[in-house]
Amino acid sequence: MGSSSGQPEFDYLFKVLLIGDSGVGKSSLLLSFTSNTFDDLSPTIGVDFKVKYLTIGEKKLKLAIWDTAGQERFRTLTSSYYRGAQGIIMVYDVTRRDTFTNLSDIWAKEIDLYSTNQDCIKMLVGNKVDKESERAVSKKEGIDFAREYGCLFLECSAKTRVNVEQCFEELVLKILETPSLTAEGSSGGKKNIFKQNPAQTTSTSSSYCCSS
């Protein structure tokens, strides 16, 4: 049932951030989740943004998902997008070991530095498991990292869509279990999380799906 503006109604609005090195597949992961398609995409310039509607249990959710550039020259641009995020997904490429080591050297430190939400739910995602023969990071290493840094963990393939929906759904379920985050995201008290400079986003799109 839609609202008077033609947009689907929702109970919660959550901001989710995708971070990680350039080329690990953040944009492809987001595209696979929001539109059920896959493309080998060029690196994001600055920040991209998409909206996804879904239903989990009886809760209608609106996810504002921010896809950040991994290149160092965009770090000062993307740092402001950590503010107010209820969920952060750290993505690495299981076939490129440097993208895994940079999680602790760069990305976990950025979360500590820029995240304004101490209860923010973090998830570690190892992408490109469809290239198993080229694997350079074991699943156990991912599990150990997630345990050390207090993250959820999944491996996935944006290309084959294995575990793509699970990545976002498990993150959202954990957010829903965290009272301080649901209070922030309730439709009655939602923040202006869309009001970062729109000139810095490269595209805006939306999709709608329901899952149980």
UniProtKB/Swiss-Prot annotation:
GO terms for MF: GTP binding; GTPase activity
GO cellular component: nucleus; plasma membrane
Motif annotated as Effector region, chain positions: 41-49
Pfam families referenced in this protein's UniProt entry, alphabetically: Ras (PF00071)
Alphabetically ordered keywords of this record: Acetylation, Cell membrane, GTP-binding, Lipoprotein, Membrane, Nucleotide-binding, Prenylation, Protein transport, Transport
Residues bearing a lipid moiety (S-geranylgeranyl cysteine): C209, C210
Xref: InterPro entries: P-loop_NTPase, Rab, Small_GTP-bd, Small_GTPase
Binding site for GTP: 20-27, 67-71, 127-130, 157-158
The species this protein was found in: Arabidopsis thaliana (Mouse-ear cress)
Biased amino acid composition, Low complexity: 201-212
Region (Disordered): 182-212
Entry's family note: Belongs to the small GTPase superfamily. Rab family.
Keyword Metal-binding: no
Main function: Intracellular vesicle trafficking and protein transport.
One example of a Gene Ontology biological process annotation: protein transport
Lineage, broadest ranks: Eukaryota, Viridiplantae, Streptophyta, Embryophyta, Tracheophyta
Domain of life of the organism encoding this protein: Eukaryota
The protein, known as: Ras-related protein RABC1
Protein topology in the membrane: Lipid-anchor
